[in-house]
Swiss-Prot record:
It comes from Acanthamoeba polyphaga mimivirus. Residues 11-83 form the BTB domain. This is Putative BTB/POZ domain-containing protein L55. InterPro entries: WD40_repeat_dom_sf (IPR036322). Belongs to the mimivirus BTB/WD family.
C-alpha cells in the first residue's frame, strides 16, 4: 500500500515489512526523514548502515499489521488498535522493537484458560519487571509447577511479600502494592497537620488530625481505618474527637477524671511497639505536655514540662524518653529522670533493648552516644567514655560514633545499630564494637522489613529494598518522595513466594541428583 502525498523532495523510500512470526508481508512507501525523526530503529538504519543508500528496504518486524499502522501514524494517519489484551501486548512489542519507549500493559486481565497463551506471548518479549507484574496479576496459582523455571526464577525476584502505607510530603496517605507498583489513596490533608500510626497486631490504621477551631485551640480527631479483605482496601470505620479520662495524681492514689476532649497542637507522636498505646507532645495554653494515651481504654496521663520538647520516644517497657531544650542546654529524660545534658543539639533517640538509649549530638561532628538507663548515671561506671578517630568502641565511660556528615536516621535490630548518614547505611555491631558494613542507599531513612531486609526512603529520595547481609539492592519501589512509611504483611504474596521457592529448590535438588 502506498501513502498519499509522498513526493521526491521528501526522500521517499519503499519499506517492505516481513512478519517474523509468519509469511505476512506489507509494502509501504514512506518518507525517510520522517522515519529518522520519529523512530530510533530507522534513525540508526539510515545513518549507519547500507540501507541508507537503498530505494527498497526489507525489514523483519513483529506483527506487520500493527507495525504498519504505527509507521503510517508517523505520517499523520489515525491509528486504530483494538483494546483487547492480545492487541495491546502486540502493540507494546512493536513499539519496543522499533526502539520507542512505552509502558507494558500491566493492568490487563485474562481468563484462567487464557494464561498459557498470555505466557507464550510474553515469552516472545522476555521476562522483565513489567511483564512479570502482568503475569503475577493473572497467575492461576493452582498450576505453578507447570510454569517455566526461568519465569519462576524472575518471579521470585520481582514478587514482594509485603506492601507499605506511605505518607508523602503533600499530605497524602496511600497503600502501595510493592509488586505491582500501584497505590490506593486512604487519606489526604493538604496542610499535613496530622500524624499516622499503624498497629500491626490489629491491622488498624490510625490518622490523628489536628484542626484549629474557632476557639483558637487545636481540636484533635481520630480516624480509624480497618482493612476490608473483600474490597481489598482500607476503609474508614470510625471518626471521632480524641477524648479520654485523665489520671489525676493526688495524695492517697490516682483518680480518674470525667472523660474530656484532648485539646492542643500535637507536635510529636510515637507508638508503643507492642500495645495500642501512644506517647505524644502536645502544646496548649503555652505549656508543653507529655501525654501517654491508651487507645483501647481511652485513659491518659499528662506531665507538664517547663522547657521546649524537641523529640520523644516510647520504649518497649512502657517508659518514655524525651529531649528538652532550655536556652543552649539540651537534656535527655528517661521516664522523667534526667540522664544527660549537653550544650549540643540532641536528636534521634530510640531504645536498644530496654535499658539503653541511643541518641545523636548535632555539633561540628555528628556523634552517636549510648547511655545506660538501668541506673541513674551519676557515676563514671554508668556512662561510656568517648572514643577517638571517628569510630565506635566500648570503653570505661561512653561510646561515640563520629562523622562530619549529618545523621538522618537511627534504627536498632538485634545486635546491630543502623545509622543513615550521607545517604549511606552504616551497620554497627554492638558485640564486635565496630562498623561491619556500609551500604550506599541514596536515602535518608530506613525501615526494617525482617531480619535481613530494610526499605530505604526519604523526601526527594528513591525507595529501594536492600539485603542488609549482602548489601545488595533487591528491588526499586516506584513510589519516591516518602516522608513516613509502615510495613504491611501481604499474606497472599508471602504464601505464593514460599510455594515458588519450594518449586525452585526442588528443581535445584533434582539437577544435583
Amino acid at each position: 500500500m502506498e501513502l498519499e502525498n509522498i513526493t521526491e523532495n521528501l526522500s521517499p523510500i519503499k519499506i517492505i515489512l516481513q512478519d517474523i512470526h509468519s509469511d505476512n508481508r506489507v509494502s509501504l512507501t514512506l518518507d525517510k526523514n520522517v522515519l529518522c525523526e520519529k523512530c530510533p530503529f530507522f534513525s540508526k538504519m539510515f545513518k549507519g548502515f547500507k540501507e541508507q543508500f537503498e530505494k527498497i528496504v526489507v525489514v523483519k518486524v513483529p506483527y506487520v499489521d500493527i507495525t504498519s499502522k504505527i509507521l503510517k501514524n508517523f505520517h499523520g494517519y489515525k491509528m486504530e488498535i483494538s483494546d483487547d489484551w492480545k492487541s495491546q501486548i502486540k502493540l507494546y512489542m512493536c513499539y519496543d522493537y522499533l526502539g520507542i519507549k512505552t509502558d507494558f500493559p500491566t493492568k490487563i486481565k485474562v481468563q484462567d484458560y487464557c494464561f498459557d497463551e498470555l505466557l507464550d506471548l510474553i515469552e516472545l518479549n522476555g521476562y522483565n519487571e513489567q511483564t512479570v507484574k502482568t503475569l503475577v496479576g493473572n497467575l492461576p496459582v493452582d498450576n505453578l509447577e507447570k510454569l517455566p523455571i526461568d519465569f519462576l526464577t524472575v518471579m521470585d525476584q520481582e514478587l514482594v511479600d509485603f506492601d507499605i502505607i506511605a505518607i508523602d510530603n503533600n499530605g497524602v496517605v496511600s497503600e502501595v502494592d510493592c509488586t505491582m507498583n500501584t497505590l490506593k489513596k486512604i487519606y489526604e490533608q493538604s496542610d499535613c497537620n496530622f500524624h499516622v500510626q499503624y498497629f500491626e497486631k490489629t491491622q488498624k490504621l490510625m490518622v490523628l488530625s489536628s484542626d484549629n477551631v474557632s476557639t483558637g485551640y487545636n481540636q484533635n480527631t481520630i480516624h480509624t481505618y480497618e482493612y476490608n479483605y473483600k474490597n481489598d482496601n482500607y476503609e474508614l470505620k470510625d471518626k471521632q474527637p480524641m477524648t479520654g479520662k485523665k489520671y489525676n495524681h493526688r495524695i492517697g492514689g490516682d483518680r480518674l477524671e470525667e472523660e474530656q476532649q484532648i485539646i492542643g497542637k500535637i507536635c510529636f507522636m510515637k507508638c508503643n511497639p507492642e500495645e495500642d498505646k501512644l506517647a505524644f507532645v502536645i502544646f496548649n495554653d503555652g505549656q508543653n505536655k507529655i501525654v501517654t494515651y491508651d487507645l483501647d481504654k481511652k485513659i491518659y496521663r499528662e506531665v507538664i514540662r517547663r522547657n521546649h520538647i524537641t523529640e520523644i520516644c516510647y520504649s518497649s517497657n512502657n517508659k518514655t524518653v524525651h529531649i528538652e531544650k532550655n536556652n543552649s542546654v539540651n537534656s535527655i529524660y528517661y521516664n522523667g529522670i534526667l540522664l544527660f545534658s549537653e550544650n549540643n543539639i540532641l536528636r534521634y533517640i530510640c531504645h536498644v533493648n530496654n535499658d539503653v538509649i541511643v541518641f545523636n549530638e548535632h555539633c561540628v561532628n555528628q556523634k552517636l552516644n549510648f547511655v545506660k538507663t538501668t541506673r541513674i548515671p551519676y557515676y563514671g561506671s554508668d556512662i561510656f567514655r568517648p572514643i577517638k578517630n571517628d569510630s565506635f568502641g566500648f570503653n570505661d565511660d561512653k561510646i561515640i560514633y563520629g562523622t562530619e556528615n549529618s545523621i538522618t536516621d537511627i534504627k536498632y535490630k538485634s545486635d546491630h545499630i543502623f545509622i543513615v548518614s550521607a545517604k549511606t547505611i552504616v551497620v554497627y555491631s554492638i558485640f564486635q564494637s565496630s562498623v561491619i558494613k556500609e551500604i550506599c542507599c541514596g536515602a535518608t531513612n530506613i525501615k526494617f522489613i525482617d531480619r535481613d531486609r530494610v526499605i530505604a526512603y526519604g523526601i526527594n529520595c528513591p525507595t529501594n529494598i536492600y539485603n542488609i547481609s549482602t548489601g545488595e539492592k533487591i528491588k526499586n519501589i516506584d513510589y519516591p518522595n516518602i516522608k513516613q512509611l509502615f510495613i504491611l504483611n501481604n499474606v497472599k504474596n508471602y504464601a505464593l513466594k514460599q510455594r515458588i521457592k519450594a518449586i525452585l529448590n526442588s528443581h535445584t535438588l533434582k539437577k544435583l541428583i
